[in-house]
């Protein structure tokens, strides 16, 4: 799974939905032919729909526990993992193709005109970055002791309305994959 939050923070509905999605993904690994997969997916959906409106939370929790145990015994030993998903064969392999953000400065105005909202927002970020750069560097110099570690996590903003130092790369991300 890409991200598994602690179970105590999920609502009952979220737990059921995640179990349903995991069960369908494992069913895809068992049923390669699409028509058979669809048939068994409909049967599984019907089983989940049977207890959709269960009012007694104790019974609903017990049903969820039993369903998770059944999933554990019926899960596929080698489930299909999409290549770009965490654990997939191509996960995070495209770092060499990620274009640095500054390359967008060289775009022709006609290219920028195709994405007016993005470039308008980008110009606002650039302006804010130019205005806050000196303050950010000064704050970092004040908070970093001489000879201290230079690789620590960045300190948070200290004043109301200020941005954390060197925030620029947090809010702008390169493309995930090449076109």
Curated annotation (Swiss-Prot):
Function: Accessory subunit of the mitochondrial membrane respiratory chain NADH dehydrogenase (Complex I), that is believed to be not involved in catalysis. Complex I functions in the transfer of electrons from NADH to the respiratory chain. The immediate electron acceptor for the enzyme is believed to be ubiquinone.
Similarity comment text for this entry: Belongs to the complex I LYR family.
Quaternary structure annotation from Swiss-Prot or TrEMBL: Mammalian complex I is composed of 45 different subunits.
Signal peptide (from-to): none
Region (Disordered): 136-162
Modified-residue entries (N-acetylalanine), positions: 2
Biological processes, Gene Ontology terms: mitochondrial electron transport, NADH to ubiquinone
Phosphoserine PTM sites in chain numbering: 85
Membrane topology category: Peripheral membrane protein
Listed Pfam families: Complex1_LYR (PF05347)
CDD domains: Complex1_LYR_NDUFB9_LYRM3
Protein's recorded name: NADH dehydrogenase [ubiquinone] 1 beta subcomplex subunit 9
Localization per Swiss-Prot or TrEMBL: Mitochondrion inner membrane
Principal location: mitochondrion
Keywords assigned by UniProt, alphabetized: Acetylation, Electron transport, Membrane, Mitochondrion, Mitochondrion inner membrane, Phosphoprotein, Respiratory chain, Transport
């Amino acid at each position: 799974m890409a991200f598994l939050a602690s179970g105590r923070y999920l609502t009952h509905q979220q737990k059921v939905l995640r179990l349903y999605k995991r069960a369908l993904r494992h069913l895809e690994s068992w049923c390669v032919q699409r028509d058979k997969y669809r048939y068994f997916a409909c049967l599984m959906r019907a089983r989940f729909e049977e207890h959709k409106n269960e009012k007694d939370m104790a019974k609903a929790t017990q049903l969820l526990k039993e369903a998770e145990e059944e999933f554990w015994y019926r899960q596929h030993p080698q489930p299909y993992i999409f290549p770009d998903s965490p654990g997939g064969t191509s996960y995070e392999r495209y770092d060499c193709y990620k274009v640095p953000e500054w390359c967008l400065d060289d775009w022709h105005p006609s290219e920028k005109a195709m994405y007016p909202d993005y470039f308008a927002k980008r110009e606002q970020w650039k302006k804010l970055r130019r205005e806050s750069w000196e303050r950010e560097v000064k704050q970092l110099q004040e908070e970093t002791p001489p000879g201290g570690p230079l690789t620590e996590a960045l300190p948070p903003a200290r004043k109301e309305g200020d941005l954390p130092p060197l925030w620029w790369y947090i809010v702008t991300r390169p493309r995930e994959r090449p076109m």
